[in-house]
């Protein structure tokens, strides 16, 4: 049995493609893995705050020296990190906004990427502290298309960033399913959604 952390980051509700597809995956997954548990966090509708000066002061100082104010500043981060580390697998629904991820998801990442908790640093450099055997599935929605080897590939700051920051914490087994070309005409949209649903079915069988 596994504990899956499912995160949606779109501010949209029923109109969100990334929500629908991540839900479709988890529903099918639960049918074939009924013993697994799912922890759900909705960043689109319940965003976490951006880091601020008290947060930074707390994150880069010894807990033994924390005042009540600093303890309060880092409390949510500790909760989010504990939740993140307790997961065995991760499913993220992430739309592309302006070539990158939503600010809600970036704020969450900033809360959980913390020295001494999810990464360490010494004279030899950085080391991820999250178990590298844990798998990540990221389902994205995109208005355009950014195929490798084309001029548009350079515009994709979504997948490269997520691979980099997850790898920084130690998570390197990352699978992407892109529902793209959603604003490039009805035919392209329908084909991309069908391809994404096929990829979801394959992920349910093989992930």
Swiss-Prot record:
Task: Work out whether the entry's keyword set contains NAD.
Answer: yes
Q: Does the record carry Ribosomal protein as a key word?
A: no
Top EC class per UniProt?
oxidoreductase
| Co-factor binding details | Binds 1 FMN per subunit.
Entry's InterPro entries? Flavodoxin_fold, Flavoprotein-like_sf, FMN-dep_NADH:Q_OxRdtase_AzoR1, NADH:quinone_OxRdtase_FMN_depd
What EC designation does it have? 1.6.5.-, 1.7.1.17
Functionally, this protein is described as follows: Quinone reductase that provides resistance to thiol-specific stress caused by electrophilic quinones. Also exhibits azoreductase activity. Catalyzes the reductive cleavage of the azo bond in aromatic azo compounds to the corresponding amines.
What is the name listed in the Swiss-Prot or TrEMBL entry for this protein?
FMN-dependent NADH:quinone oxidoreductase 2
Organism whose genome encodes this protein: Trichormus variabilis (strain ATCC 29413 / PCC 7937) (Anabaena variabilis)
